[in-house]
Amino acid sequence: MDRGLSTGAHQGDDGLRERTVASQSSSAPGLEALTATGEGEVKDKAGKGKKTYGRTPGGKVFTVPQTHDMVSQLLSPSEPKNLSDIIVLVILAAHILLLWRLPAGAKVPVFAFIYLFWRGAYNAGIGWLLHNQSNHRTLVRWAEKTKIFVNPATGQNSHANLYKLIKRELKTKIPADYSFEDAPIEYNTWLVFRRLVDLILMCDFTSYCLFAIACSQRPLDEGTLMTALRWSAGIILVLFNLWVKLDAHRVVKDYAWYWGDFFFLIDQELTFDGVFEMAPHPMYSVGYAGYYGISLMAASYKVLFISILAHAAQFAFLVFVENPHIEKTYNPPPPRKRTIDQENVSITPQRSDSPSAPAPLDEQVPHAPSYSSGPPPSVHNLLGFRNLDLYRTIDTSSILIQFLVFALTVLTPSTPWFQFLFVANAAVWRIWYSVGIGLVLDRQSNCKAWTRHFVKYGESPQEAWNQWKGTYHISMVMCYASFIAAVWKMYSFPADWGYGLVLLRHVLGAGLIALQIWTSVSIYESLGEFGWFYGDFFFDESPKLTYDGIYRFLNNPERVLGLAGVWGAVLITSSGAVTFLALMSHILSLGFIQFVERPHMQKLYGRSLRRDAGLTKSLKRSLPPSLQQLHGSVDKIFDESFEFIEELIDTARPKLAAGVNTFVKDTSALFQKYPARVTISRIDEDLAGYDSRDYSLEVEGTDSLSPNDNDQSGREGANARMPLDRRGDLKNLVFEYGSPIKVKWTAPLNHSKKDWIGLYRVTDNTSREVTRVSSQGRWIAVNEGSYDNLTCEKGIVSSDILIPASQRKDNENRDLASGEVIFSGDKLFWTQGVFEFRYHHNGKHNVMAISRPFEIRISRFDEDEIPLMDPTSVELSLFPVVRNCFDRDPQIAPETVDEPFGSLVERDGRYAKRIVFAVHQMFGIEFAPEVVKADGNVHNLARRICNAKRVLAPYSLTKNGATTPTEGKE
């Protein structure tokens, strides 16, 4: 419902800390710009309303009639009512009646269960339906299979009464511009889906309110003033929630409210205003403020906790259902660049700042280095658990330092002396993190002091950048580790959780901590590694501001939200010392923004900075003119005050800079399978009449270049060294890694339309009659339209082609049906091994035929023939493997060794992982997937392989020293 979709792009003109995002395409605004799929009318030049047009996935264009929201349809007397409305109203009335009739002791548990049921139906039920509709068009396929929208007069629909009921229900709700018979099946399916959504959403909200009523109470020791304040705050939150819902519906209309883009798209101009300028995904974030308002009015922790649970479930719905669909629908990867700028290639065939493999060692000659002004490619990121690398000094140092800090925290007593030490330590680190780092960045902004220091000793700007990232990372880790340690020392476990506001303080504190974590993650997602570490202080090439993610709504999210967690710690501890640390942290953070970030951003971006973010604009528009003028006067006072402080600091800056410079010179820096699934084998008892001799599977694929590698290594006995004696002309099937595999099948003419073919390892199944291992998505149906998803039909080439009995090789006199399917991409095993295909009966796991076993093998590069690792030879060997790893998709697979990879490689890590596995098997070199993304084409990757082989040659265990320490040929 929320969709979070009307967060579209708007042209900004100011903002801080929204830095240049290196190595990111400008496609990000495309996601935001196209995700507000409101159903407002497209208007002509005269301003007259025009019709809205929709487009189905098949390309059919139709008129989208005007519809109304569910509350108006159900409760407004002016709206026509039908059977489904009456059913919903009766169910709602039953909920209210149940609350009235239940005994007092049963109301709370019963309505807690009822609400959790409807909340599960919303987030899990509707989420499952939408997920399958997005990926497999499941709801539309159900409608196609049951033919419920087909006129029974045609003889194709046997449910005449159901057809009449649905037709009457839909036409009653949409009297104009709607024809049930002519509307696309996608639109009719969406209308039926809406009725289910109406039922679930109305019951969800009603049961929540009834649960709150059942839990409502007034604390015994609460005064009249506190009661009035509690109810006033609750009512304000509920009214704010109501405004958010109404304004969001005004913008997105019913189309996005009911997830219409899961079924079809509409052609119209997009509008971005109101609540969608205030917060990301407002219906799922600030749109749940009313839940906490109701919790306040009910004065019940039960209502508060169930509200938090519901809010968390709604965010899970957003993350796992809506966001993947939005990304797929509105932000597809840009097409791959098929041509290369020949002029640039001829002049500078290998730019120094391009993400390419390093030059061979023997080609390097002493000369003055030329430094690139552009940022280095981001290959090995620093932040995040997935980027943790214990071989990297900064990561190991961070872990060791944190371990020592927390060990000291736990092992030392919480006496006043130790509490003072830990608070002082946290204060020192906060001062360094804000003031010390701020001075370093200020000197870097004005005179490139940090970079000059490393260039002075012959290092590159990239090395200065890497060292800076380590320094900043350690400082940030120690700042927060020391703060957490101080909080731990000042915290005392409550003796009575029910006393006063103890429990509420802990809940609010945990919420603020979660808010800071979410803010930090959002900032990192928007800025990337480059912006997080203030990359535009170090590299000035082509500065460009981007306002997306959290920066669409706030210029400086770290100004308030970025420090919410420290105030959460204040609430939890109720300690004066922690309050002092939080206040100091906030003041220093504001000073850092004002005196370090703002001057640099103004110098670098000038007038391209916007003055007001989306939230600020919305709040200003809501103020009366007199208050807007007052706001401007206050801003002027603050600006003048900050200018005075800046002048004061400028006067004292030389002395401070000299001290910091001495300190820097005299100090040296220190320091993911799918969960196992229980698979129940489904055995069909109705196998009578099917002859297994009528079923067969024949496999065809691209033969491996060296299918006989290592067949005879000299380790065998005398008899085993003799040439292989084959009885027949069948040879071993050995296919290339990742190449598509064609499977030809035969079956009786009366075979089940739900038959399917699966791919398995030969060792996975001990039974030849029943498959007891999950295919994990590696299966294809033999007929189209038999299953409720489209994925299983990808790969079908032909079905039910008649083979006369005269053409059978086994001399049987029965005709057969035949077909072809092609397994490719995700339907293959991306590893080496021996595999087989199995033909299964009627959607179950009964095996009717098994193919010949075949091997998937990656041919090892023959270094004896080319001992010098010629890059051209490596390119020729690597190129077909890379194309296979990219599923031979023209959008991402290159046509030549110099063509760049498609942009999807940057988003989906599986492609790069396939390549690094193949490289490891072919050349004995292990790369990280990020290397493939950074190199960008086969040519650069081949050069990197050659260089790596040369570098590691001295450590080789083979005779000629041409390979790395791996299992070599003997």
UniProtKB/Swiss-Prot annotation:
Q: Does the keyword Lipid biosynthesis apply?
A: yes
List the catalysed reactions. Answer: a 1,2-diacyl-sn-glycero-3-phosphoethanolamine + S-adenosyl-L-methionine = a 1,2-diacyl-sn-glycero-3-phospho-N-methylethanolamine + S-adenosyl-L-homocysteine + H(+)
What stretches pass through the bilayer?
86-106, 110-130, 196-216, 224-244, 278-298, 301-321, 390-411, 417-441, 474-494, 497-517, 563-583
Its annotated pathway?
Phospholipid metabolism; phosphatidylcholine biosynthesis
Question: Where does it mainly reside?
Answer: endoplasmic reticulum
The membrane-topology field of this record reads:
Multi-pass membrane protein
Pull the Cytoplasmic topological domain ranges from the record.
107-109, 217-223, 299-300, 412-416, 495-496, 584-970
Q: Where is this region: Disordered?
A: 1-59, 330-375, 698-722
**Which Gene Ontology molecular function entries are recorded, alphabetically?**
phosphatidylethanolamine N-methyltransferase activity
A Gene Ontology cellular component where this protein is annotated is: cortical endoplasmic reticulum
Q: Which UniProt keywords apply?
A: Endoplasmic reticulum, Lipid biosynthesis, Lipid metabolism, Membrane, Methyltransferase, Phospholipid biosynthesis, Phospholipid metabolism, S-adenosyl-L-methionine, Transferase, Transmembrane, Transmembrane helix
| Lipid metabolism keyword on record | yes
Stated role: Catalyzes the first step of the methylation pathway of phosphatidylcholine biosynthesis, the SAM-dependent methylation of phosphatidylethanolamine (PE) to phosphatidylmonomethylethanolamine (PMME).
Protein name from the UniProt record: Phosphatidylethanolamine N-methyltransferase
Source organism (scientific name): Neosartorya fischeri (strain ATCC 1020 / DSM 3700 / CBS 544.65 / FGSC A1164 / JCM 1740 / NRRL 181 / WB 181) (Aspergillus fischerianus)
